[in-house]
């Protein structure tokens, strides 16, 4: 990227063009690499160095008579933790989804953020199976006892990470690991389950760890993969929880969701202009 070693050469080209009127300097920007680790001293020092380098180039541009009109440097992490570098604009990315830049910084509520996206589906087939029943491809999950299973009609073709599969097979070559968390809205109240076996192209399966009839779980019940909850410990899974289950980050959980999943927009009429509303399917506006 652009480093201090290139400042003089860049200004030597920019200044004549600006004086000729063929170049108008509107903005100056850079991107912080490790602003999402405010508790790691070496990363804080690295961010401080980036900030000072940015300010140094601003001073050089001003001295050359071509000051930038708009400066923007702060990503979500810096927007939340470094108000002194907000300058004229900030660039919250994951913050627009209502999430902190990294779980190490806290939770959305730490910064008065509210997660803006909820991913829901309805249960497909619910059926009873015996103990030792293999679930999904590869039999990487065996039911430990007589139980019921339920299909969730979302898969990796929809952007559900295959790496969020759940393995539980004694003696298998696969390491036992929990799958992605799912909140099932039962007639007896919400319950938390996990992906059992491999995520398939169009679906994944839940082991309900009991009789569906006794648990009050039926085909068509609503399920929530993530939403504005407090986390899987409260049976309210978040995108951060799915990021951990899939060995990735919430950014990827959000941006991998495919267009096969219908979008519904809450409060759209309150926040969007008539021009933007016209771009949406009326049936998607709640």
What positions do the PLM features span?
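Active-site loop/helix belt of alpha/beta enzymes
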Residues: 1-130
């Amino acid at each position: 990227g652009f480093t201090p070693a290139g400042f003089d050469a860049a200004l030597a080209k920019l200044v004549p063009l600006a004086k000729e009127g063929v170049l108008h300097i509107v903005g100056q920007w850079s991107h912080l690499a490790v602003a999402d680790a405010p508790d790691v001293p070496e990363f804080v020092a690295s961010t401080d160095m980036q900030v000072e380098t940015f300010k140094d180039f601003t001073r050089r541009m001003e001295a050359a008579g071509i000051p930038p009109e708009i400066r923007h440097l702060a990503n979500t992490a810096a927007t939340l933790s470094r108000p002194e570098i907000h300058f004229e604009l900030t660039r919250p990315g994951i913050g627009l989804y209502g999430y902190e830049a990294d779980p190490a910084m806290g939770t959305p509520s730490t910064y008065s953020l509210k997660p803006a996206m909820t991913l829901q589906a309805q249960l497909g087939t619910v059926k009873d199976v015996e103990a030792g029943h293999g679930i999904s491809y590869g039999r990487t999950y065996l039911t430990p006892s007589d139980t019921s299973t339920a299909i969730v009609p979302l898969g990796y073709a929809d952007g559900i990470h295959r790496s969020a599969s759940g393995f539980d097979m004694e003696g298998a070559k696969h390491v036992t690991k929990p799958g992605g968390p799912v909140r099932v809205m039962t007639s007896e109240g919400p319950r938390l389950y996990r992906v059992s076996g491999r995520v398939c192209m169009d679906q994944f399966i839940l082991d309900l760890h009991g009789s569906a009839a006794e648990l009050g779980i039926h085909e068509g019940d609503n399920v929530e993969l993530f939403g504005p909850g407090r986390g899987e410990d409260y049976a309210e899974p978040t995108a951060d929880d799915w990021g951990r289950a899939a060995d990735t980050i919430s950014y990827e959980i959000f941006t991998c969701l495919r267009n096969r999943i219908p979008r519904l927009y809450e409060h759209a009429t309150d926040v969007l202009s008539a021009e933007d509303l016209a771009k949406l399917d009326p049936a998607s506006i709640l």
